[in-house]
Curated annotation (Swiss-Prot):
This is DNA-directed RNA polymerase subunit beta''. It is an enzyme of class 2 (transferase). It catalyses: RNA(n) + a ribonucleoside 5'-triphosphate = RNA(n+1) + diphosphate. One of its GO terms (molecular function) is DNA-directed RNA polymerase activity. One of its GO terms (cellular component) is mitochondrion. It comes from Phaseolus vulgaris (Kidney bean). The keyword Nucleotidyltransferase applies. The keyword Magnesium does not apply. Binds 1 Zn(2+) ion per subunit.
C-alpha cells in the first residue's frame, strides 16, 4: 500500500457517478478485498455522522418560496391573454393546450430551481434541505410539492388536466385541487402496482430465454466480426466507449504498416485511448452475434467480465446475468413514480436570448415562414443560420442550428434577454411520441360554415367527415332550432327580416327550414286567434327575427302551381334538373323522367378535368334481374368518375376509373342470384333443375326455371339459377370445356340426320362439369342492348350548355356501369341501371391555361319581382396560391379578409336553362348586374339579368361600354319557373344578399387589375341604388363615407378629407370578421364582435354573431357545410403528437414491444419497393447467387443491430447504461430460429419445422446442396416455448400441452440448461458444477481411451498367439 504522505487530499462533494469511478480505480490498484475494506469504512463513517446529527422533520421546516405569489399571477395573466387569442380565432385548441402546459410547467420548474438557493440563503441547516438535496431521503420533486406548487396533474388516462394545482401541501389544498390531486395520486398508485409487476414479468421472460447460455469454450474459431467506426461524429463518445471497452478484436489493427493490436486481444482503457488518439480504421470486434456455438458462447466472443475486468471465466452463467441486467433497471425505475403522485412531467424547448440591445440581421433566403407549436409566427431554418446583432461598433454573432424557429424579423430591434430563437431538442435524447386525438366541441348552437374548400376523408366516403387541406377558420353562426312535427311553406324568402307584431293577423306558421343530412329542422312561431289579449311571445324577446332557409330555398307553393315536383331533394349533392320541352305532352313526360337526370356537384364545388357534370339514367337500359354483362368489342377508354376518385392529398394523386366502351351493342345474360347464410336449410341440390315457384328455402321461391348452381363463399352460400336449355355435345364439338362463349344467330344442325334449325337470337353456351366423365352444355338466352348515338342524346340537355365553345367543352358520352364479364347482383324490388348517359366537363389544354387544374361550380341566385332564378356558373380556376403578406407591409394587419384572393377566374361560363334567348332594352326595365372579372385585358364582360329573367352578355372594348338597341319581348311569368334549375343547394360561400341596379350608358374606365380608376370620378357617372331587405331604396350621396364597388360587390369606407391613395378597409356582404376588428378608420371606432356581415346600410352594419375556430391542415371536420350543430357537438378533431411522461414506466411497454416483436410504428408504404430495389442493385453488382446470399446476411445482421439500438434508446433516455453484450445475447436468441420451407429440406427436416439458424447452415454444408429456409423474428415468449428442453418449456407456460406433445413426439431432454437441472434436482452446469461436468467428461473420455487401448492389446496378443500356434 502506498504511503500516506504520497496520497492527495480532495475536499469536494462526490456523486454517484464519481463513486463508481472511484471504486473501479480502487479495484484496479488494490484488488477486491482491500477495496471492500475501504468501502466498509466509508459506510461506518456515514452511519456515525447520521446518528450524531439526529435530523427530525417538522411542518415548520417547510418554507414557502417568497416569490411564489407574483409568479402565479404572471402565469394566470399569460393564460388570460392566451384565452383571448383562442377566442379571436388566432390560436387553435392544440396550440392553446401546448402553450398553457408550458406556461405552468415553466412556472413550476422555476419554483424547483429556486428552492435550493432559497434554503441555502435563508436556512442552510434546514432538515428538508439537508435530506433532499444530499440525496439521503426524498428528491427535489417531492420537496417541490411540499414547498413550491403541486402543478399540473395527470388524469387516469395519462392526459394532462388543464387546471393546475397552485397550492402546495404546506399551504393546503382547496376542494377542487384536492379532487384533482386524488385523480393523479390514484393513477400513481395504480401505475406503480401494475408496472412493477410488468417489469418483474419482463425479467422472468428474459431469464427464461437465455438461462441455458453459459461460457463453455475459450474460442469458437469464428472469423466474423462487427465493424465500429471510431470517426463517426454522429455517435457520442460515451456510446462507442461503452461499445469497445471490454470487447475482443476480431482482426488485427494497423496504423500505417505497424500493427498496434492483434486478433483475439481484449480492449482495455489503454488500447482504447490509442485507438482514439490515432484515429484508426474501423475496428472489427467479436460479439455474441458472431459466435459459432449453438447453445452457449465462447470466452472471446463475450469479452471481459463486467465485475473483474479480465476475460470471463469458463462456466459463467452469462445468460442469466444478461436477463437480469435488462430487467432489473425497469423494476427499479418504476420506483421513481412512487411518491410524486401522478405529477405531469414534460419538456420545453431550449431558448436563445439576445445578449444585449441591438438590431438583428440574417439572410432571409435561408428561412421559411411558419407557425410555432404555440401558434406564433416564426421562421424555420433548414441549415445553420448565422444571426448577427449590431449595437454601434459591437457585433455579436449567434449560430442557430437547423430545424430551429427564429422568432424575430430581419432588421428588427431586440432588447437584452429577449427570446430570439427556439432550438429543437437534442438529437440523441429519445422522446416517446404518441398520437393523441383532441376533440373540439362547439360552445354555440348554430350553423356551420368554413372559409376554404375541404376534402372528403377517403375512408368515410358518404359520411359527414371532411379533411381540411390548409389552415383556415371554421365558423359557427349563432341560431337556434326548435324541433317541431309540422312543416309548412313560408311566404318569406331567405334572409328576410320580419316583425313579430305583424304575425297577429291570424294563425300563421313561419318556419325556418334548415336542410342538413336529409333532415329538416325549423323554428316555429305559433299564434292562436283565441289568445288576442296576449300579443307577445315569451320565448322570443327580440323584435326582428331573420329567417334563414339555408340552401333549399323553399318558396310559396302557389307560385309553382303544378311544377313543385321539380323541387330538388338533396341526395349526396346531386340535384335534379328538368328537360327541354315544347308542348304539354312533352312537359308531362319530362316531369315523369325528371328524377332521372341529375347534376352532380362535388361537396367542395370543385371539378377536375374529364369530370362527369350531369348524367341521365335511361329507363330502357334498366333491368330487374341479376346477370352478367359482355361487350362485343374490347376498345376501352377511361373516364373519370367523381364518385370513385380518391381525394388528392399533398404529394399524392390517386384516381380510380370506370370503363367507357366505344361499342354499339353489348349483351346481358340474366340469372337469378341469392346470397344465403351458411346455416340456411336449402331445399334444392346442386346441378338440379327447378321449375318456376319452386321453394328454395323456407321464405324464398324461384322466379324462373333452370339449372341450380351452389357455391360457398366466405361463410355464405351463393345460389344461382341459370335459365336455358341443356345440350349434351358429341366428341367433335368445338366448345371449350374451360370457358363459355357467345354464339351469334346462325343455322345449326339439330341432329345427325341433317335437319337444320335457324337461331334468331344470340345465345350463351356455358360448359357445366358435374364429374370428370359427366358434362353438358347449358345454352342460356341473351338480351342484346344497342347504345344510342350521340346525336340522339343531345336532346336531353340544354342547347345553351352544349354550345359553349370558349374554353369549356361539354361532351355527351355513354358509358356502361359494369366491366366486361362482371356479374351484377340486384337487390329485391330495385332496378339495375346498365348504361348511363353523362355530360363530361373538359377544357382546352393550351399553354396559356396550362396551370388550370380545377373548375369551380357555383349557383347564382337572383330574385326579381318576387321570382327566384338560379344560374349555374362554372369558373376555371388555377391551383391554389397561398397568399403570404409581406413582413414590412402594414396593411392587412388589422383586418381579416375572406378567401376571394385565392381564386383566379378565367372567362367564367354561365348557362341558363331557358327556352330562347331574350333581349330587352335596358331603358324599360331595371336589371341586376353581376360583373365578371377576366384576366384578358382587351375584353371585359358584363352579365345583365333583367327582371324578365332573360340574360345577355356584353363586352367592354378598350374599357368602354357602348349603347345598343335591343328589341323588347313579351313576358311569360311561367317560363322562368318551368325552365329554372330549381332550388339547388351547394356548399359555397354565402351569396350576396343585396341587389344592385344599374341605369347608365356612360363610359366606365377600368384599370389593368380590374379596379375602378379614380373612385370619385367614376361613381359620379354611376346611377345606382341600394335595396335592403325591406325593399326600401337608398340613393347614397357621393360625399358620404361609403362607396359601392360593383366589380367586387364590396363596400369602401373613407372620409371627406382622406387621400385617394390611402388604403380602405373593405367589407363584403357575407364576409366573416373576427372579434376586436375595427372596420372604420376613425377615433373611438367601435370594435365589433366576431360574426358574419348580413346587411350594410348608410349608418349601420348588421352582423350575425359567430364563433371562429382555427384549424390546421389534416384536421378532421365533423358535419356538412351549413349543418346545424347543437351546443356541445363535436366540431373538429385534431391529431397531434405528444411527448409521453418522462419516466421509464412509459418506456417499458416499448421495450416489451421490441422484445416481443410487435410493431411499434407504422410500416412504410414503400418498404417492399425499397427491398426490391436493394436486391436488384446487389444482384446487378455481385451476380445472382452472391447477391441474394449477401442480401440475406446483411438483413439478419442489420436487424439485430437495429433491435439493440431500439432497446438502448429507451434506457439511455433515463440515464441507465446497460452494456450492449447483455442485449446482444437476448437478441441473438430471438433471431436464431428459421422456418423450414417446402422446397429442398424434406430429406432432413419437416416443412414448417422451427430449427436453429446455425444448425440449418451446418446441415446445408454437410449435405452439399442449397437449403431453403426463412429467417424468423420470434418474441421472447415464443422463443421460450421453442427450445431444446421440454422441461424448461413446461415450467414456463402451457405445462399440459407441452408435456403432451413431448410425449407424443418422443422428445429427449439432454438437460443442458440450468432450469431443467433445477427442476430435476441435478447438478447445475455452471460455476463449480461446470468444472465437475468437465472433469466427468474428461474422466469418461479417459476411460474410453483406456478401454479401447486394452481391446487393441488383447487383439494384438491373440493374433500373436495364433501366429505362434500355427
Amino acid at each position: 500500500m502506498a504511503e500516506r504522505t504520497n496520497l492527495m487530499f480532495h475536499n469536494k462533494v462526490i456523486g454517484g457517478t464519481a463513486i463508481k469511478r472511484l471504486i473501479s480505480r480502487l479495484i484496479d490498484h488494490f484488488g477486491m478485498a482491500y477495496t471492500s475494506h475501504i468501502l466498509d469504512q466509508v459506510k461506518t463513517l456515514g452511519f456515525r455522522q447520521a446518528t450524531a446529527t439526529s435530523i427530525s422533520l417538522g411542518i415548520d421546516d417547510l418554507l414557502t418560496i417568497p416569490s411564489k405569489g407574483w409568479l402565479v399571477r404572471d402565469a394566470e395573466h399569460q393564460n388570460l391573454i392566451l384565452e383571448k387569442q383562442h377566442h379571436y380565432g388566432n390560436v387553435h385548441a392544440v396550440e392553446k393546450l401546448r402553450q398553457s402546459i408550458e406556461i405552468w410547467y415553466a412556472t413550476s420548474e422555476y419554483f424547483r430551481q429556486e428552492m435550493n438557493p432559497n434554503f441555502r440563503m435563508t436556512d442552510p441547516f434546514n432538515p428538508v434541505h439537508i435530506m433532499s438535496f444530499s440525496g439521503a431521503r426524498g428528491n427535489a420533486s417531492q420537496v417541490h410539492q411540499l414547498v413550491g406548487m403541486r402543478g399540473l396533474m395527470s388524469d387516469p388516462q395519462g392526459q394532462m388536466i388543464d387546471l393546475p394545482i397552485q397550492s402546495n401541501l404546506r399551504e393546503g389544498l382547496s376542494l377542487t385541487e384536492y379532487i384533482i390531486s386524488c385523480y393523479g395520486a390514484r393513477k400513481g398508485v395504480v401505475d406503480t402496482a401494475v408496472r412493477t409487476s410488468d417489469a418483474g414479468y419482463l425479467t422472468r421472460r428474459l431469464v427464461e430465454v437465455v438461462q441455458h447460455i453459459v461460457i463453455r469454450r475459450t474460442d469458437c474459431g469464428t472469423i466474423r466480426g462487427i465493424s465500429v467506426n471510431t470517426q463517426n461524429e454522429m455517435m457520442p463518445e460515451s456510446t462507442w466507449t461503452q461499445t469497445l471497452i471490454g470487447r475482443v478484436l476480431a482482426d488485427d489493427i494497423y496504423r500505417g504498416s505497424r500493427c498496434i493490436a492483434v486478433r483475439n486481444q481484449d480492449i482495455g482503457i489503454g488500447l482504447f485511448n490509442q485507438f482514439k488518439t490515432f484515429q484508426t480504421q474501423p475496428i472489427s470486434i467479436r460479439t455474441p452475434f458472431t459466435c459459432r456455438n449453438t447453445s452457449w458462447i465462447c470466452r472471446l466472443c463475450y469479452g471481459q467480465s463486467p465485475t473483474q475486468g479480465h476475460l470471463v471465466e469458463l462456466g459463467e452463467a452469462v445468460g442469466i446475468i444478461a436477463g437480469q441486467s435488462i430487467g432489473e433497471p425497469g423494476t427499479q425505475l418504476t420506483l421513481r413514480t412512487f411518491h410524486t403522485g401522478g405529477v405531469f412531467t414534460g419538456g420545453t424547448a431550449e431558448q436563445v436570448r439576445a445578449p444585449y440591445n441591438g438590431k438583428i440581421k440574417f439572410n432571409e433566403d435561408l428561412v421559411h415562414p411558419t407557425r410555432t407549436r404555440h401558434g406564433h409566427p416564426a421562421f424555420l431554418c433548414y441549415i445553420d443560420l448565422y444571426v448577427s446583432i449590431e449595437n454601434g461598433d459591437i457585433i455579436h454573432n449567434v449560430t442557430i442550428p437547423p430545424k430551429s424557429f427564429l422568432l424575430v424579423q430581419n432588421n428588427q430591434y431586440v432588447k437584452s434577454e429577449q427570446v430570439i430563437a427556439e432550438i429543437l431538442a437534442g438529437t440523441y435524447t429519445f422522446n416517446f411520441k404518441e398520437k393523441v386525438r383532441k376533440h373540439v366541441y362547439s360552445d354555440l348552437e348554430g350553423e356551420m360554415h368554413w372559409s376554404t374548400n375541404v376534402y372528403h376523408a377517403s375512408e368515410f366516403k358518404y359520411s359527414n367527415v371532411h379533411i381540411l387541406p390548409k389552415t383556415s377558420h371554421l365558423w359557427i353562426l349563432s341560431g337556434k332550432s326548435d324541433r317541431s312535427g309540422s312543416v309548412s311553406f313560408s311566404t318569406r324568402k331567405d334572409q328576410d327580416q320580419l316583425n313579430i307584431h305583424s304575425l297577429s293577423t291570424g294563425e300563421r306558421d313561419i318556419c325556418n327550414h334548415l336542410a342538413s343530412n336529409n333532415k329538416i329542422r325549423h323554428k316555429l312561431f305559433h299564434f292562436n286567434p283565441s289568445e288576442k289579449k296576449e300579443r307577445r311571445i315569451s320565448d322570443y324577446s327580440i323584435i326582428n327575427q331573420i329567417i334563414c332557409i339555408d340552401h333549399c330555398h323553399f318558396t310559396h307553393p302557389a307560385i309553382f302551381h303544378d311544377t313543385t315536383d321539380l323541387l330538388a331533394k338533396r341526395r349526396r349533392n346531386r340535384f335534379i334538373i328538368p328537360f327541354q320541352f315544347q308542348s304539354i305532352q312533352e312537359r308531362d313526360k319530362a316531369l315523369m323522367l325528371a328524377s332521372s337526370i341529375s347534376i352532380e356537384i362535388p361537396i367542395n364545388g370543385l371539378f377536375r378535368r374529364n369530370s362527369i357534370f350531369a348524367y341521365f339514367d335511361d329507363p330502357q337500359y334498366r333491368t330487374q334481374s341479376s346477370g352478367i354483362t359482355k361487350y362485343r368489342t374490347i376498345d376501352i377508354n377511361y373516364i373519370l368518375k367523381k364518385e370513385d376518385f380518391v381525394i388528392e392529398y399533398p404529394g399524392v394523386k390517386e384516381f380510380k376509373t370506370k370503363y367507357q366502351m366505344k361499342v354499339d351493342q353489348f349483351f346481358f345474360i340474366p340469372e337469378e342470384v341469392y346470397i344465403l347464410p351458411e346455416f340456411s336449410s336449402i331445399m334444392v341440390r346442386n346441378n338440379s333443375i327447378v321449375e318456376v315457384d319452386t321453394p328454395i328455402t323456407v321464405n324464398i321461391r324461384s322466379q324462373v326455371s333452370g339449372l341450380v348452381r351452389l357455391e360457398k363463399k366466405k361463410k355464405k352460400i351463393q345460389l344461382k339459377i341459370f335459365s336455358g336449355n341443356i345440350y349434351f355435345p358429341g366428341e367433335m364439338d368445338k366448345i371449350s370445356r374451360h370457358s363459355a362463349m357467345l354464339i351469334p344467330p346462325r343455322t345449326v344442325k339439330k341432329n345427325s340426320k341433317g335437319s337444320k334449325k335457324k337461331m334468331k337470337n344470340w345465345i350463351y353456351a356455358q360448359w357445366i362439369t358435374i364429374t370428370k366423365k359427366k358434362y353438358f352444355v347449358l345454352v342460356r338466352p341473351v338480351i342484346l342492348y344497342e347504345i344510342a348515338d350521340r346525336i340522339k342524346l343531345i336532346k336531353f340537355f340544354s342547347q345553351d350548355m352544349l354550345q359553349e365553345r370558349d374554353n369549356l367543352e361539354l361532351q355527351v358520352i355513354n358509358y356502361i356501369l359494369s366491366g366486361n364479364g362482371k356479374s351484377i347482383r340486384g337487390i329485391s324490388n330495385t332496378s339495375i341501371q346498365l348504361v348511363r348517359t353523362c355530360l363530361v366537363l373538359n377544357w382546352d389544354q393550351d399553354k396559356k391555361v396550362s396551370s388550370i387544374e380545377k373548375g369551380h361550380a357555383s349557383f347564382v341566385e337572383l330574385s326579381i319581382n318576387g321570382l327566384v332564378r338560379y344560374f349555374l356558373k362554372i369558373a376555371l380556376v388555377k391551383s391554389h396560391i397561398s397568399y403570404i403578406r409581406k413582413r414590412n407591409d402594414p396593411s392587412g394587419s388589422r383586418f381579416i379578409l375572406d378567401n376571394e384572393s385565392d381564386w383566379t377566374n378565367i372567362n367564367p361560363f354561365f348557362s341558363m336553362n331557358s327556352r330562347e334567348k331574350v333581349q330587352q332594352s335596358l331603358s324599360q326595365n331595371h336589371g341586376t348586374i353581376h360583373m365578371l372579372l377576366n384576366r384578358n385585358d382587351k375584353c371585359r364582360s358584363l352579365i345583365i339579368l333583367s327582371s324578365s329573367n332573360c340574360f345577355q352578355i356584353r363586352s367592354f372594348h378598350d374599357g368602354k361600354y357602348y349603347k345598343e338597341e335591343m328589341n323588347p319581348i313579351q313576358r311569360d311569368p311561367l317560363i322562368p319557373i318551368k325552365n329554372s334549375l330549381g332550388p339547388l343547394g351547394i356548399a359555397l360561400q354565402v351569396a350576396n344578399l343585396d341587389f344592385y341596379l344599374l341605369i347608365t350608358h356612360n363610359q366606365i374606365s377600368i384599370n389593368k387589375n380590374g379596379q375602378l380608376d379614380k373612385l370619385k370620378e367614376t361613381f359620379q357617372v354611376f346611377k345606382y341604388y341600394l335595396i335592403d331587405e325591406n325593399e326600401r331604396i337608398y340613393k347614397p350621396d357621393i360625399s358620404s363615407n361609403i362607396l359601392l364597388n360593383p366589380f367586387y360587390l364590396n363596400w369602401h369606407f373613407f372620409h371627406h378629407n382622406s387621400c385617394e391613395k390611402k388604403t380602405f378597409p373593405i367589407i363584403s356582404l357575407g364576409q366573416f370578421i373576427c372579434e376586436n376588428v375595427c372596420i372604420v378608420q376613425m377615433k373611438n371606432a367601435p370594435h365589433l364582435k366576431s360574426g358574419q356581415i348580413l346587411t350594410v346600410q348608410m349608418d349601420s352594419v348588421g352582423i350575425r354573431s359567430a364563433n371562429p375556430y382555427l384549424a390546421t391542415p389534416g384536421t378532421t371536420v365533423h358535419g356538412h357545410y351549413g349543418e346545424i350543430l347543437s351546443e356541445g357537438d363535436i366540431l373538429v378533431t385534431f391529431i397531434y403528437q405528444k411527448s409521453r411522461s418522462g419516466d421509464i414506466t412509459q418506456g417499458l411497454p416499448k421495450v416489451e414491444q421490441v422484445l416481443e416483436v410487435r410493431s411499434i410504428d407504422s410500416i412504410s408504404i414503400n418498404l417492399e419497393k425499397r427491398v426490391g430495389t436493394w436486391n436488384g442493385r446487389i444482384t446487378r453488382i455481385l451476380g445472382i447467387p452472391w447477391g441474394f446470399f449477401i442480401s440475406a446476411e446483411l438483413t439478419i445482421a442489420q436487424s439485430r443491430i437495429s433491435l439493440v439500438n431500439q432497446i438502448q434508446k429507451v434506457y439511455r433516455s433515463q440515464g441507465v447504461h446497460i452494456h450492449n453484450r447483455h442485449i446482444e445475447i437476448i437478441v441473438r436468441q430471438i433471431t436464431s430460429k428459421v422456418l423450414v420451407s417446402e422446397d429442398g429440406m424434406s430429406n432432413v427436416f419437416l416443412p414448417g419445422e422451427l430449427i436453429g439458424l446455425l444448425r440449418a447452415e451446418r446441415a446445408g454444408r454437410s449435405l452439399e446442396e442449397s437449403i431453403c429456409y426463412r429467417v424468423l423474428l420470434l418474441g421472447i415468449t415464443k422463443t421460450s416455448l421453442n427450445t431444446q428442453s421440454f422441461i424448461s418449456e413446461a415450467s414456463f407456460q402451457e405445462t399440459a400441452r407441452v408435456l403432451s406433445k413431448a410425449a407424443l413426439r418422443g422428445r429427449i431432454d439432454w438437460l443442458k440448461g440450468l432450469k431443467e437441472n433445477v427442476v430435476l434436482g441435478g447438478m447445475m452446469p455452471v460455476g463449480t458444477g461446470f468444472k465437475r461436468i468437465i472433469y466427468r467428461s474428461k474422466q469418461r473420455q479417459y476411460n474410453k481411451i483406456t478401454s479401447e487401448t486394452k481391446k487393441r492389446i488383447d487383439m494384438i496378443y491373440q493374433s500373436n498367439l495364433g501366429f505362434k500356434n500355427s
